[in-house]
Amino acid sequence: MAENGKTVQVTQIASVIGRKPGQAETITGLGLRGIGSTRTLEDTPAVRGMIRKVAHLIKVEG
């Protein structure tokens, strides 16, 4: 868990087909495997940066 104990839930809502390679790699780095895939991640600056990079492809809760 994160030091502050907070988590964030991310869900992929759009495909990475036709996107820049860096965006596809970021989605994979978040642990998402396809549309509808959901992961609960630690709320860290690194994760927040990845979320910002692909915000148009995911839905964030928490």
UniProtKB/Swiss-Prot annotation:
Organism whose genome encodes this protein: Gluconobacter oxydans (strain 621H) (Gluconobacter suboxydans)
Similarity comment: family membership: Belongs to the universal ribosomal protein uL30 family.
Protein's name according to its UniProt entry: Large ribosomal subunit protein uL30
Pfam family, one: Ribosomal_L30
Recorded GO MF terms: structural constituent of ribosome
Gene Ontology terms: biological process: translation
Keywords for the protein's UniProt record, in alphabetical order: Ribonucleoprotein, Ribosomal protein
Disulphide bonds in the chain: none
HAMAP family per record: Ribosomal_uL30_B
Complex formation: Part of the 50S ribosomal subunit.
PANTHER family named in the record: LARGE RIBOSOMAL SUBUNIT PROTEIN UL30M (PTHR15892:SF2), MITOCHONDRIAL RIBOSOMAL PROTEIN L30 (PTHR15892)
CDD domains on file: Ribosomal_L30 (cd01658)
InterPro entries: Ribo_uL30_ferredoxin-like_sf (IPR036919), Ribosomal_uL30_bac-type (IPR005996), Ribosomal_uL30_CS (IPR018038), Ribosomal_uL30_ferredoxin-like (IPR016082)
GO terms for cellular component: cytosolic large ribosomal subunit
